[in-house]
Amino acid sequence: MNEVSRRTILGAPYLALVSKAAAAGDGRIVGHGTHRYRVDTKWCQAKPETHPVNDCHEMVQARDGRLFLFTNHKQNNVLVLDQRGRVIDAWTLGWAGAHGLTIHADAEGREHLYATDTSSGRVVKTTLAGDVVMELAHPASIGVYSDKDVYSPTETAVGPNGDIYVADGYGSQFLLRYDKDGKFLNKFGGKSSQPISKGKFLQAHGVAIDARGEQPLVMATARIRNEFHWFTLEGEFVKTVYLPGAYMSRPVIVGENVYSGVCFGMFADDYRMWQGRGFVTILDRNNRVISNPGGRKPEYRDGRLQLMLQDEPVFHNCHDVCVDQQGDLYVCQWNSGKVYPYKLHREG
């Protein structure tokens, strides 16, 4: 096993340590309660000779069922797959730091992708075929950041009115808000190294729009703190939920549930941050953990969630979860031997 130091995770977009955990074979059942899944590690039929990947960072699904996998291999940043795992298209932005991928349909129903590059600081909107139709201004170029502020965007989300939220997760830890045409509106969040700091981040890794309540909210990951934060659409802090032991990537909200890939984890007798300890975590409408595929069954005592740990090494370092229209999951992994996504077939 390799420990990930706090200094390493905060100091660089990519971690250089290699996990020694081994993925389990096909067929085992993981998860708990109503969310149990059969693991298929061989679902993806892509071949490294023709469609190589480095890290499989994120995946989204279009309305027509196609799956878009985002990888930081410059030959093919995007692999387009059908639900049988076959590659049906591939294209590239030429990015070495391809990281965050979001899909959104506009008021006319047209779907676009929003992509981030942690290396160059680029954030673009593309067609599903890969044509760039808009690029957001770098915050330093419009006076939002100083020349000394680091900008390394990890994720985007699109609000109900088209506002675009950019998580500067490997940079200065702000959430930056632009309107649908790319005009900068405001920023909120920011970095704090204090153990408890409402609305502040240690690695604002992921962001999504949570429309499960009466009013839509911005939901963002504070990964190093094992927390999710919620804000109003304008950036006012609302609440925090703490998931002890889970270094989550981004929140993926489908129906009443939140899904997230846990990239790093702990041991029962070692609370440091380790690679090879990944699993998937699933929350209900009330943001209580109800299932941990690959992890131990969630336990609450006196209303407090207990430490969550990997149960068996099905996964190395989970970086994202895509939920298809049938409720099956596709798990993307970072720094895990260049494996393609695993499919988890819904059983429960």
Which sequence ranges carry the predicted segments?
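Surface-exposed loop and turn segments in beta-propeller and other repeat-based domains
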Residues: T41-T50, M134-D147, L185-G199, I290-P313
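Conserved beta-strand positions in repeat-built beta-propeller and related beta-rich domains
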Residues: L69-H73, L113-T118, V166-G169, A211, ...
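Blade/loop signatures of beta-propeller domains
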Residues: A24-T41
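N-terminal secretory signal peptides and thylakoid transit peptides that target proteins
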Residues: M1-A16
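Blade-level signature of beta-propeller repeat domains, shared across WD40, Kelch, NHL, RCC1
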Residues: N317-G348
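Loop/turn-rich, solvent-exposed surfaces of beta-rich toroidal or solenoidal domains
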Residues: A246-R296
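Blade-loop segments of beta-propeller domains
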Residues: N76-A107, T118
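Beta-rich, blade/repeat-based domains predominating
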Residues: E49-D64, G94-R110, S141-D163, Q194-L217, ...
